[in-house]
């Protein structure tokens, strides 16, 4: 209890620091001269800062000596001490709880013993965390003589700023009786007096039952103590409990105190010469460069050994002859012994042999009758190949003693020895798959990948037969070009759905395309054996004049086609055009990005299946003397001199600058039907008759990166968007599949392909034909579709 009281006293001193500089003040009082407190008791006067100023520098050694001897101090020192008595909260009138003043302590003799205390030392120790006051009070409590003398003439430490407003006297109901026996107040209703002289009434104590209930209900009951001097219950903190335990164990109250500090032998340790050398300049560069002189010596030794000038001694030759060739374990790890290699779980070469499989329920010697094979099953087992049939058939025996020896025991052991001897061992990492959903790649949700076309917005009706091909203008997307089996070429206004112009041609239109050159505004169409070039009439006057000049024939033309004027004019309703007549029916067209070259594909043309035409020179040429396979589609690379030729089984990539085959993309099992290039030029979409759409990454491999099979019928067309990460495929099942295809600039990141929308219900399947073509709007996330039901539909976001 003394220790806990000391801890609490130190904590109170630490919480309420004095407001004036502390000075050493020592007085001696005896229990006989102390009268019980009452209304007439002398109360401490208010703090006077000038008192501490007067007592600065006074020596209190005499007072300390007088207190120890039990005599009074000299008069002059007593006067000084009387002035110090009113100095402030550090005076004797505030009781032992504040670390100042003097009182009585029960000693071994049974009566009150004189107590001598230095207020400055105790309070200064309290400001350092309470450890000094707690230690001194504890030492005083355990002294055999029972007396307490803690005046070590230590230098006082300056307290807080005198101008501070904080003071311990402001604490209400503060007990100022001092460290006197509480038995004096045993029969009184009060315990001490406050700073105003009023009695401090005792608090109502709890009975035993209430104390027992509080101890069971509260977790803080075991570390709650009763302070009899202030008549209150105090809960000790964890730090204070640790301090009490350390004091009881005879240790320092605080862990920060190190009784065995490291001794520094500055300039006396002989090792200091190594740490602090006399010369500490940086190492020269020559220390880090191989020595040339050592290299010359090594070269001389090597030359002498090669020429036989340096020979081994007879003793060395005899030792090598006796040792023989070095022997080592072939399958052991380098640098490891046999035991270490056997114990190494992650060895480089050693892998323990797999254990034999334990017998299961199928090897039971007396299985149920329904598990025994019939005669037909036995005959089938005997006729089957030994590698495909089970090792043994179930048999029934009356007891385990009747089971004969296993006939294939030696054979199986021999095969196991062969496996251990010849077959390499491989560690297979087992996949920790908790659920099948972990095998499915985590794709983003479609609503997070918007915008993409979702809703049918407009229908363009006017064709009298199936629409074979469509193409929006590549600049503004204001106009849409379409060609159908009814022999008409129509130009539509996208926003209104009005047919702005119609050309009636000689036969069915199989393909349409715009010239990419913005200053011409030409349209092209494949009609039978001809490729027709017509002015669109949608541009300004300068574009119309440039188109008329481009369509003027300057020469007879040469190469694989015959350039004529007036052919389309005879079958057109307005305007003059230009036609390139070929030998075989044309099925598709492809323009170069600059708008001067375009290629036509005639699948039945054999050696003239692919013809490249130049508009500025009116020339046509056949780039291939021999085609390996039937050509289906062609395309120009948007930025590089590459030419893509899709046959029924492969996609060949030719370098036009080197006139050589650059790459060959391998197809699947189906016949290729459509082709599309990514605007970046590094990715290719190919549709085939096996209902698949293959995505090729030219920088990754010649095999498909992804094979998408979402259609129930062969795809007829594929298309990329020019500005949005979208691509689509149209098939004969009447649906259009829209995908999110993000291509990253980082070559180490694979493209992200996510199906986002299925556009269905717009087209009707007619004669096993559904959607014939699809094309994206050049600037908006819209898509145009053309079907065999003579409809052209626009889907918007």
Swiss-Prot record:
Residues 74-87 have a biased composition (Acidic residues). InterPro entries: BOP1/Erb1 (IPR028598), BOP1_N_dom (IPR012953), WD40/YVTN_repeat-like_dom_sf (IPR015943), WD40_repeat_CS (IPR019775), WD40_repeat_dom_sf (IPR036322), WD40_rpt (IPR001680). One of its GO terms (biological process) is maturation of LSU-rRNA from tricistronic rRNA transcript (SSU-rRNA, 5.8S rRNA, LSU-rRNA). Its main location: nucleus. Keywords: Nucleus, Repeat, Ribosome biogenesis, rRNA processing, WD repeat. It holds the Pfam family BOP1NT. Residues 61-73 have a biased composition (Low complexity). It comes from the Eukaryota. GO terms for cellular component: nucleolus; nucleoplasm; preribosome, large subunit precursor. Residues 22-112, 149-177 are annotated as: Disordered. It is found in: Nucleus, Nucleolus; Nucleus, Nucleoplasm. Coiled coil: none annotated. Residues 90-112 have a biased composition (Gly residues). GO terms for molecular function: ribonucleoprotein complex binding. SUPFAM superfamilies: WD40 repeat-like (SSF50978). WD repeats lie at residues 462-502, 504-544, 581-623, 626-664, 667-706, 710-749, 766-797. Required for maturation of ribosomal RNAs and formation of the large ribosomal subunit. Belongs to the WD repeat BOP1/ERB1 family. This is Ribosome biogenesis protein BOP1 homolog. It comes from Chlamydomonas reinhardtii.
């Amino acid at each position: 209890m003394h220790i806990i009281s000391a801890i609490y006293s130190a904590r109170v001193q630490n919480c309420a620091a004095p407001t004036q500089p502390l000075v050493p003040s020592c007085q001696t009082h005896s229990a006989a001269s102390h009268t019980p407190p009452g209304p007439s008791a002398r109360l401490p006067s208010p703090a006077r800062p000038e008192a501490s100023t007067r007592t600065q520098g006074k020596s209190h050694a005499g007072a300390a000596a007088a207190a120890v001897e039990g005599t009074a101090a000299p008069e002059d020192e007593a006067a000084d001490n009387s002035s110090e008595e009113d100095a402030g909260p550090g005076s004797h009138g505030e009781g032992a709880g504040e670390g100042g003043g003097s009182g009585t302590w029960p000693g071994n003799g049974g009566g009150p013993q004189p107590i001598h205390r230095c207020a400055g030392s105790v309070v200064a120790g309290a400001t350092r965390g309470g450890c000094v006051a707690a230690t001194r009070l504890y030492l005083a409590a355990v002294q055999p003589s029972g007396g307490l003398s803690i005046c070590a003439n230590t230098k006082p430490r300056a307290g807080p700023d005198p101008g501070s407003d904080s003071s311990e006297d402001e604490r209400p109901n503060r007990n100022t009786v001092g460290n006197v026996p509480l038995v004096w107040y045993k029969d009184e209703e009060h315990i001490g007096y406050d700073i105003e002289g009023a009695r401090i009434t005792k608090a109502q104590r709890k009975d035993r039952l209430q104390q027992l209930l509080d101890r069971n209900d509260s977790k803080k009951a075991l570390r709650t103590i009763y302070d009899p001097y202030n008549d209150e219950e105090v809960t000790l903190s964890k730090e204070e409990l640790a301090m009490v335990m350390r004091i009881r164990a005879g240790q320092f109250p605080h862990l920060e105190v190190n009784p065995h500090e490291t001794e520094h032998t500055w300039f006396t340790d002989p090792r200091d010469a190594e740490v602090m050398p006399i010369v500490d300049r940086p190492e020269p560069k020559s220390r880090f460069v191989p020595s040339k002189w050592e290299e010359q010596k090594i070269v001389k030794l090597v030359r002498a050994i090669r020429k036989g000038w340096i020979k081994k001694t007879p003793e060395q030759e005899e030792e090598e002859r006796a040792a023989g060739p070095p022997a080592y374990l072939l399958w052991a790890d380098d640098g490891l012994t046999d035991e270490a290699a056997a114990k190494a779980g992650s060895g480089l070469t050693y892998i323990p042999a797999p254990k034999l499989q334990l017998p299961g329920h199928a090897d039971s010697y007396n299985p149920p009758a329904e598990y025994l094979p019939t005669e037909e099953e036995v005959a089938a087992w005997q006729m089957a190949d030994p590698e495909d049939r089970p090792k043994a058939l179930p048999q029934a025996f009356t007891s385990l003693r009747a089971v004969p020896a296993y006939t294939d025991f030696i054979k199986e052991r021999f095969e196991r020895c062969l496996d251990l001897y010849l077959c390499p061992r491989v560690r297979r990492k087992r996949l920790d798959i908790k659920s099948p959903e972990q095998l499915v790649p985590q794709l983003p949700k479609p609503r997070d990948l918007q915008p993409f076309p979702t809703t049918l917005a407009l229908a363009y009706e006017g064709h009298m037969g199936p629409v074979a091909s469509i193409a929006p203008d590549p600049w503004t997307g204001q106009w849409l070009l379409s060609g159908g089996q009814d022999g008409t070429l129509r130009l539509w206004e996208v926003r209104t759905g009005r047919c702005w112009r119609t050309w009636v041609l000689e036969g069915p239109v199989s393909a349409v395309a715009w010239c990419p050159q913005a200053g011409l505004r030409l349209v092209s169409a494949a009609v039978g054996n001809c490729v027709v070039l017509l002015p669109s009439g949608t541009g300004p006057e300068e574009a119309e004049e440039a188109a008329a000049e481009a369509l003027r024939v300057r020469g007879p033309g040469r190469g694989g086609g015959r350039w004529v004027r007036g052919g389309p004019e005879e079958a057109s309703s307005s305007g003059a055009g230009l036609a390139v007549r070929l030998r075989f029916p044309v099925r598709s067209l492809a323009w170069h990005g600059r708008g001067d070259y375009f290629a036509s594909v005639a699948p039945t043309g054999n050696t003239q299946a692919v013809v490249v035409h130049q508009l500025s020179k009116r020339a046509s040429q056949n780039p291939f003397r021999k085609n390996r396979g039937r050509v289906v589609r062609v395309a120009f690379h948007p930025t590089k001199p590459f030419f893509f030729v899709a046959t029924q089984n492969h996609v060949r990539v030719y370098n036009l600058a080197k006139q050589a085959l650059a790459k060959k993309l391998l197809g699947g099992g189906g016949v290729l039907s459509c082709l599309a290039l990514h605007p970046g030029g590094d990715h290719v979409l190919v549709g085939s008759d096996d209902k698949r759409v293959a995505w090729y990454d030219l920088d990754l491999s010649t095999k498909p990166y992804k094979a998408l099979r979402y259609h129930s019928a062969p795809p007829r067309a594929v298309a990329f968007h020019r500005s949005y990460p979208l691509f689509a495929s149209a098939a004969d099942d009447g649906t259009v599949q829209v995908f999110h295809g993000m291509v990253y600039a980082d070559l180490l990141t694979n493209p992200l392909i996510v199906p986002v929308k299925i556009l269905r219900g717009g087209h009707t399947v007619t004669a096993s034909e559904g959607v014939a073509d699809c094309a994206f709007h050049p600037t908006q996330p819209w898509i145009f579709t053309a079907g065999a039901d003579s409809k052209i539909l626009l889907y918007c976001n």
